[in-house]
A protein has these predicted regions:
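Non-catalytic DNA-recognition/assembly elements of restriction-modification systems
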Residues: 1-13, 18-29, 126
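Short, surface-exposed beta-edge/turn micro-motifs
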Residues: 23-25, 44-46, 70-72
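Short, ligand-facing micro-motifs at secondary-structure edges
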Residues: 13-18, 35-68, 81-88, 96-102
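Amphipathic alpha-helical coiled-coil/heptad-repeat segments
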Residues: 122-172
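Extended Lys/Arg-rich polyanion-binding regions
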Residues: 75
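Hydrophobic aliphatic residues
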Residues: 6-7, 90, 164
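A short glycine-rich beta-alpha junction/loop motif
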Residues: 66-72, 104-127
């Protein structure tokens, strides 16, 4: 199945200068960093990937109101596909597609057809798609919890190093 047979594909309309630090809505730009905006142009569930920069490496799952940069692509309005499942599928395989296409020509930006004409295999039942998405989401949650714990230990170690190596705390 081609991606274009599964969903609609479009781009945003906003520019980076449209960001507002304390904005109401998420604003997805050409980066993994999510900015803020006081306006939204979409209110849907979908998948975003960037059009240039670290192509094939930045993906966002969205659900609700958001603003979107003009060089970002949104896949939405899916036909019988669990969107979170599609997020995992697309984010896993799209980078390899970018690499394969770059062997034929220099690829420094994404074109709509790179997404639209990508072949994907989708389990036939929504139940299987949801089961896969749930397992992968649980794994991501576990990884995030471990990373948060790791970051906390690093901060504690830094504090201990500061105290011990400056002599503020003595062990003997």
């Amino acid at each position: 199945t081609l991606v274009e047979k599964c969903c609609k594909i479009t781009t945003g309309e906003s520019n980076t200068r449209d960001q507002i630090e304390s904005g109401i809505y998420p604003f997805y730009i050409r980066s993994a960093t999510v900015m803020r905006s006081n306006s939204y142009i979409f209110d849907c569930e979908g998948i975003i990937t960037i059009g240039d920069g670290q192509i094939g490496k930045v993906f966002h799952y969205v659900n609700g109101k958001f603003d979107l940069h003009q060089r970002c692509y949104l896949m939405y309005d899916f036909d019988d596909i669990d969107v979170k499942f599609f997020y995992f599928l697309f984010s896993f395989f799209f980078y390899n597609r970018v690499i394969a296409l770059s062997a034929k020509a220099t690829v420094d930006s994404v074109r709509r057809n790179m997404i639209a004409k990508m072949k994907i295999n989708i389990p036939s039942t929504m139940q299987e798609q949801k089961a896969i998405a749930n397992i992968l989401s649980d794994m991501n949650d576990g990884i995030e919890a471990i990373e948060a714990k790791r970051d906390k230990y690093i901060a504690v170690r830094q504090g201990m190093m500061q105290q011990l190596l400056t002599g503020k705390i003595r062990l003997i």
